[in-house]
């Protein structure tokens, strides 16, 4: 991985409680190129992001390193949704010349150790787009709340019916993209909200990107459970995907 320029992309909305811990944990695992997109937060998320960015700059100056190992804080003045924040992050990673980009949730539910799992198939030149699946991990699937099991499997099937690749965990926030996939998705993604995960799979199939899945684990806490998708969001994703299919992009 040493010769690959890898960027982590973290969409964040009102994540003042977790964002510093999440970024520091990634840095402790030697993932230092991190793009955080604040999606119009109303708390201190962006303030903390700027502090992390400044710390990164100071570390670079102390090590005479002006190019890499950096935290980049980007702010949306108005909330655009997780899809909008993801698109901003993907475009920035592509602009910076990333060989691989990885999306990573801001609520602490992902384990940094799993990043290597989603990256490896791309490094091996076998895949262009890799989804980290909680459902392919038998232990994780057993521990997953029933509503999440039904919702994830249902949305994965709906995504397939609407023209996307079938993957077991279509709503996973931990995904890796090669440079070619990064270019395609940064140019073609339109979805602004949670339906962005499904739209990415539809675009990937349309462009014949080579896709794969790897099992990952999930760190379930009261905090992450409260911030994930629920039944109502699942219905909204379905509706918004139908609108996309008809050529209508909803805010």
From Swiss-Prot:
Reaction it catalyzes: a di-trans,poly-cis-dolichyl phosphate + UDP-N-acetyl-alpha-D-glucosamine = an N-acetyl-alpha-D-glucosaminyl-phospho-di-trans,poly-cis-dolichol + UDP
Primary subcellular site in the record, as a coarse category: membrane
Membrane topology classification: Single-pass membrane protein
EC number(s) from the headed UniProt entry: 2.4.1.153
InterPro entries: Glyco_trans_2-like (IPR001173), Nucleotide-diphossugar_trans (IPR029044)
Species annotation: Methanococcus voltae
Gene3D superfamilies membership: Spore Coat Polysaccharide Biosynthesis Protein SpsA, Chain A
Protein name stated in the entry: UDP-N-acetylglucosamine--dolichyl-phosphate N-acetylglucosaminyltransferase
Pathway as given in its UniProt record: Cell surface structure biogenesis; S-layer biogenesis; Protein modification; protein glycosylation
One record GO biological process: N-glycan processing
